[in-house]
Design a protein with these regions (language model features):
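Hydrophobic ligand-binding cavity/cleft-lining segments
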Residues: 1-42, 46
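Glycine-rich portal/gate segments that line the openings of hydrophobic small-molecule binding cavities
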Residues: 38-87, 101, 134-146
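Beta-strand/loop substructures that line and gate deep hydrophobic ligand-binding cavities in soluble
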Residues: 79-134
Length: 146
């Protein structure tokens, strides 16, 4: 298992950042890997909600079943189960001037089989190249513009 982390600050408060994180239409704009929400049990990502997302990774079409464990002003935590398992957490902390600090972590857990290992390595390479930090930048920019 490999875990990738990134942290940034935002002029927007935790509620505004959470609104971007839980908006299914915004996912395609900020996700570190291009994915689209195919099916969602609730209008927004919320605690207990489930979603089906799909996209392309390393030239392969992949799909993930997502379960949201937390979605509140403290952050968003979810797990995604597919050819690679992902444990994702965004922590939100208010700062003294009305903004927030946003920390993200993504744990990549490879599954069995050659394809799964290759996709895990591709996911790790994308995250190691700074994609998570760039995603945080897009999240806070959208939250600040709202």
């Amino acid at each position: 298992m490999r875990t990738y982390t990134a942290t940034t600050t935002s002029t927007a408060g935790p509620a505004a950042v959470l609104a971007v994180l839980t908006d299914p239409d915004a996912v395609a704009r900020w996700a570190p890997v291009d994915f689209y929400v195919d099916d969602l049990t609730h209008p927004r990502l919320s605690e207990g909600s489930r979603a089906r997302v799909s996209g392309r990774l390393a030239g392969q079409r992949v799909g993930f079943d997502v379960q949201v464990h937390q979605a509140d002003e403290g952050g968003l935590a979810l797990s995604a189960d597919g050819p690679v398992a992902l444990d994702v957490a965004y922590e939100l902390r208010a700062d003294a001037v009305g903004g927030s600090e946003v920390s993200a972590s993504v744990a990549v857990l490879p599954r069995r089989g050659l394809r799964a290992r290759l996709l895990a390595e591709a996911t790790a390479a994308v995250l190691a190249s700074g994609a998570l930090q760039h995603a945080l930048g897009r999240i806070v920019a959208e939250a600040s513009a709202a």
